[in-house]
């Protein structure tokens, strides 16, 4: 063909096409050819909030294709990819998805007073502050020490000196501290200053604001100079979190202001130390007011509350479920992180993780993990030992993952060699403390070229460095061995292959959802349902039931009870009766109207028996007369009015001729789906009433997952390329949009779905739970999994809100009429579907509409009105059939409409509903 630029949309098109031939795929496939395979233990999917961009099924498919034996799914704070991962692998397939999470870990185990020996709060303290050339005690130097000695609550001595760092002071440090090279040029070296300072601190407890930073410099320099260093240290930042919970930030100036302490010359050591001393003195008084007089009791107070944990710094941490107990504990941790400890991120306190770590494997994660960060800041050997002891295995990652640390815009740019040293240090710690070290990719997209999707999403979120994407793709075994060749061939093989496989083999192949059905139990529900139905049947049809009633009731009850469905009917019955008692009708949706048991138990007003007459007074009934038989397949209300031949009272007209099989299937074993429309203004009360039925804590709202939609993704893509001044063809735009679509944005709740937990079961054995959209201000709790993922396990009640019951209640209040007593074949009501005469208005008064159905739900749209004009309904059953034709694709247009227009059928003879299929075609 001939390629041209289309003059309408300016897109490349091919004209004068003579033929089409499929070309071979020219892309080079990525395959893992190494004889032994690694296992990826750190992988994100689209369920990592606006971060991961790959579908879990594609990730698993790739790992299986490469011959890997397992892969760990570890999304940020969420486990919503688990069910799709489970569906991606058959039960018989040896491939093993490992279920985990990258948690936001909070170290609430660290004490307010480290190395406490129970000293009195009125003991001797040295409150000190350091100024340094940077943040690393290994790489950087002390340039000033300021301290005050406090005895019995009074300042008794001061210590202040510059220290010659023997290196130039960085410009940013000079700007921050106002200390320049000339000020420290003639100052003593640390070799002279530190022994003097230690003498000043003898027999005292050390106090500092963010003590871990200052103490790390003291400890590192003591180690370097061979000086003893074993102090008790109190951190006023941690203490402020306990004593000043109303604060959101705990910087020195913020805490000083909150306590009314003056701070001058901030970022000068002696002034900051004096300010911290005043702060600490006020804190001591606050502690004494609580009856706390020593450091041990202060540490007891420091056991953090949920509010404190929400304000503490968090670190990344990998948690893997090694078995089914671990899965339940993982769901418990995910739930509590969302419900109790959520503040921008779902946080997991170390103390809680420690308590429920059985069945779990805990990894140190990425550069956002506390171990990596401690190494970067030069933490002491003692601190590193404490951190390492918490983990089951340690992680290292490719240098490319952390290359952002070498950029000039970082506070302290690192070199590539330093990045290697950080990983080498982790490997050494693993050897020293007998912890396996594994190499992971921290996968956020499947292939290198997929970074464009994450780049655009991050740009859409406002990240200025979105274009500097780290290579967070899934690597082959050979690629990973090459990444870590600087460790030596043997060690690289160990961290890439041996250890990852060993960790994977410690995890059993489990299902993330329980396979069993766990419906709720209401004691004696079988008998209750039977009694309710027979009592109502006798009330309507008399003590001796007509054979058709007896047979239908017996057949339905047998199917319902034998399959364990009675409890579902009783639940629906209780909800409907409660709503009716409170003055609101309930509309039954869908096929529940085909169940005669639902009618007799008061769940629905729809009677599915064949059209018939019955007498409320003497219980006369007529199912079989020729006059009645003429209305087979129609609605009983369409039959002519009659008086009872026995007592002369007007007969009731009932029956819609709906087979039971349309509800519970041909064998009667299909689980009933009882959808109910409650008044919108009563819906919340109906939801609350489920707690009355089942008890508090036994019901949850059905959760949903909100993902990036096509149109939103298109907006992200379009805006990104417009900002870059780049033109992309529509086909390329659509390709990129497809890669961005489906990424999780938020969570929500089904408008009426209630998940019921049986007594004796724990929700965590089925799903984690959370607040919708992590709204901590609501008391609504939803399932963390999308409700479709667990609807085979737990009963879902559809308690939907609808305008119709509300409108009916309002009309009843306005008119004084009982809606249930208005006959369905009322002549004036039926005339609304043919003209406007009953309304006593002309079509011109309502925009030219020829019918009076504008205000009738489902019949007031332009499409529905045209259907009414085409079909000319005469009976109520015609309206039912029209409603059947109005739902579904190509049911009316080009189908039933054509048959009616051509005179081949009428609305009464066309196949319009499932009931017609059962009654006429089977």
Q: What are the residue ranges of the model-derived segments?
A:
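Long, highly charged low-complexity segments
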Residues: 26-32, 110-126, 130
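Helix-rich "cap/lid" substructures immediately adjacent to catalytic or cofactor-binding pockets
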Residues: 530, 543-587
């Amino acid at each position: 063909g001939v390629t041209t630029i289309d003059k309408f949309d300016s897109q490349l098109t091919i004209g004068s096409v003579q033929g089409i031939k499929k070309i071979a795929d020219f892309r080079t496939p990525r395959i893992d050819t190494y004889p032994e395979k690694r296992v990826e233990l750190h992988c994100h999917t689209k369920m990592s909030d606006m971060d991961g961009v790959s579908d879990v099924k594609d990730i698993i498919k790739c790992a299986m294709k490469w011959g890997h034996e397992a892969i760990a799914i570890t999304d940020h704070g969420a486990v919503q990819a688990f069910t799709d991962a489970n569906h991606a692998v058959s039960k018989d397939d040896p491939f093993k998805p490992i279920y985990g999470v990258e948690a936001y870990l909070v170290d609430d185990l660290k004490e307010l007073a480290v190395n406490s020996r129970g000293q009195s709060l009125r003991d001797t303290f040295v409150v000190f502050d350091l100024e340094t050339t940077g943040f690393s005690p290994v790489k950087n130097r002390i340039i000033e020490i300021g301290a005050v000695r406090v005895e019995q609550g009074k300042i008794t001595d001061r210590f202040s000196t510059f220290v010659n760092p023997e290196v130039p002071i960085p410009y940013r440090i000079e700007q921050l501290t106002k200390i320049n090279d000339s000020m420290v040029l003639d100052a003593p070296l640390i070799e002279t200053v530190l022994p003097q300072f230690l003498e000043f601190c003898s027999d005292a407890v050390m106090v500092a604001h963010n003590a871990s930073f200052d103490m790390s410099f003291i400890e590192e320099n003591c180690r370097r100079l061979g000086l003893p260093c074993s102090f008790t240290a109190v951190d006023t930042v941690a203490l402020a979190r306990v004593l000043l919970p109303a604060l959101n930030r705990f910087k020195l100036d913020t805490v000083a202001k909150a306590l009314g302490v003056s701070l001058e010359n901030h970022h000068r050591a002696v002034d900051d130390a004096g300010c911290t001393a005043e702060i600490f003195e006020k804190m001591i008084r606050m502690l004494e007011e609580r009856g706390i007089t020593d450091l041990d009791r202060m540490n007891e107070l420091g056991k953090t509350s949920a509010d404190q944990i929400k304000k503490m710094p968090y670190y990344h941490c990998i948690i893997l479920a090694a078995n089914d107990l671990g899965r339940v504990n993982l769901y418990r941790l995910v739930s509590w992180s969302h419900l109790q400890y959520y503040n921008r991120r779902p946080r997991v306190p170390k103390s809680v993780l420690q308590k429920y770590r059985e069945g779990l494997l805990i990894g140190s994660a990425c550069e956002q993990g506390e171990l990596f960060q401690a190494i970067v800041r030069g933490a002491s050997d003692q601190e590193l030992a404490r951190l390492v002891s918490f983990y089951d295995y340690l992680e290292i990652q490719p240098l490319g993952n952390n290359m952002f640390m070498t950029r000039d815009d970082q506070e302290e740019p690192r070199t590539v060699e330093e990045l290697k040293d950080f990983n080498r240090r982790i490997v050494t710690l693993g050897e020293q403390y007998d912890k396996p070290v594994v190499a992971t990719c921290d996968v956020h997209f499947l292939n290198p070229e997929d970074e464009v999707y994450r780049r655009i999403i991050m740009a859409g979120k406002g990240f200025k460095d979105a274009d500097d994407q780290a290579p967070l793709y899934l690597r082959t075994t050979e690629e990973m061995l090459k990444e870590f060749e600087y460790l030596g061939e043997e060690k690289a093989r160990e961290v890439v292959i041996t250890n990852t496989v060993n960790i994977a083999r410690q995890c059993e192949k489990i299902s993330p959802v329980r396979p069993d059905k766990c419906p709720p139990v209401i004691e004696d529900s079988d008998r209750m349902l039977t009694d309710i139905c027979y009592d109502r049947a006798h009330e309507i049809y008399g003590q001796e039931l007509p054979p058709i009633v007896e047979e239908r009731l017996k057949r339905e009850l047998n199917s319902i009870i034998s399959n364990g469905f009675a409890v579902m009917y009783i639940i629906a019955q209780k909800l409907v009766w409660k709503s009716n008692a409170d003055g609101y009708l309930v509309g039954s949706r869908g096929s529940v109207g085909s169940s005669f048991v639902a009618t007799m138990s008061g769940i629905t007003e729809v009677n599915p028996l064949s059209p018939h007459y019955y007498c409320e007074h003497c219980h006369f009934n007529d199912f079989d007369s020729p006059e009645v038989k003429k209305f087979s397949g129609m609605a009983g209300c369409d039959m002519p009015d009659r008086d009872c031949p026995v007592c002369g009272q007007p007969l009731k007209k009932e029956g819609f001729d709906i087979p039971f099989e349309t509800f519970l299937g041909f064998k009667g074993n299909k689980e009933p789906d009882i959808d109910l429309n409650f008044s919108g203004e009563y819906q919340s009360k109906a939801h609350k009433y489920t707690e009355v039925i089942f008890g508090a804590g036994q019901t949850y709202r059905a959760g949903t997952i909100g993902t990036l939609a096509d149109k939103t993704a298109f907006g992200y893509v379009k805006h990104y390329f417009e900002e870059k001044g780049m033109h992309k063809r529509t086909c390329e735009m659509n390709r990129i949009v497809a890669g961005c679509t489906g990424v999780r944005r938020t969570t929500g709740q089904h408008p009426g779905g209630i998940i019921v937990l049986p007594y004796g079961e724990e929700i965590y054995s089925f799903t984690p739970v959370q607040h919708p959209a992590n709204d901590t201000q609501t008391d609504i709790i939803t399932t963390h999994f999308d409700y479709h993922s667990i609807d085979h396990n737990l009963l879902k009640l559809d308690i939907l809100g609808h305008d119709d019951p509300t409108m009916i209640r309002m009309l009843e209040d306005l008119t004084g009429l009982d809606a249930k007593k208005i006959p369905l074949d009322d002549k004036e009501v039926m005339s609304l579907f043919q003209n406007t005469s009953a309304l006593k208005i002309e079509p011109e008064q309502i925009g030219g509409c020829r019918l009076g159905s504008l205000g009738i739900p489902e019949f007031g749209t332009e499409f529905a009105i045209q259907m009414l004009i085409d079909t000319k309904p005469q009976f109520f059953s015609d309206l039912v059939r029209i409603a059947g034709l109005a739902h579904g694709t190509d049911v009316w247009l080009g189908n039933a409409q054509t048959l009616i227009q051509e005179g081949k059928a009428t609305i009464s003879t066309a196949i319009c509903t499932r009931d017609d299929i059962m009654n006429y075609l089977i």
